[in-house]
């Protein structure tokens, strides 16, 4: 299990750690071979608060949603379909974004 920070505009995750890094970790990546994996938003209130504070920055590089920027009254993020990432040139890169919804 690898914990990833946000994905930038090029689809590259800005950091990857073996443990959750408060204030940075947004996604959890599951991989068997270290080359390809599936990722989802980490399901904790702390990550939801951070990601919902600026979804354009924290979520848009790795997620799709019906209305990603509309977070009024939202307190949780649910991953409906995990995204896919590949390890390339020493970094994890988004192949397919995860689909999320807010609650």
What kind of feature is each model-predicted range?
Residues 1-54, 85-86:
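Charge-dense, E/K-rich amphipathic alpha-helical interfaces
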Residues 34-103:
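Extended, amphipathic alpha-helical stalk segments that mediate dimerization
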């Amino acid at each position: 299990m690898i914990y990833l920070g946000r994905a930038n505009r090029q689809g590259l995750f800005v950091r990857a750690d073996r443990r959750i890094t408060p204030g940075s970790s947004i996604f959890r990546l599951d991989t068997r071979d270290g080359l390809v994996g599936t990722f989802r938003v980490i399901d904790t209130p702390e990550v939801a608060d951070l990601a919902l504070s600026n979804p354009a920055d924290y979520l848009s590089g790795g997620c799709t949603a019906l209305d990603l920027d509309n977070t009024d009254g939202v307190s949780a993020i649910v991953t409906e379909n995990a995204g896919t990432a590949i390890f390339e040139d020493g970094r994890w890169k988004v192949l397919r974004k995860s689909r999320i919804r807010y609650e």
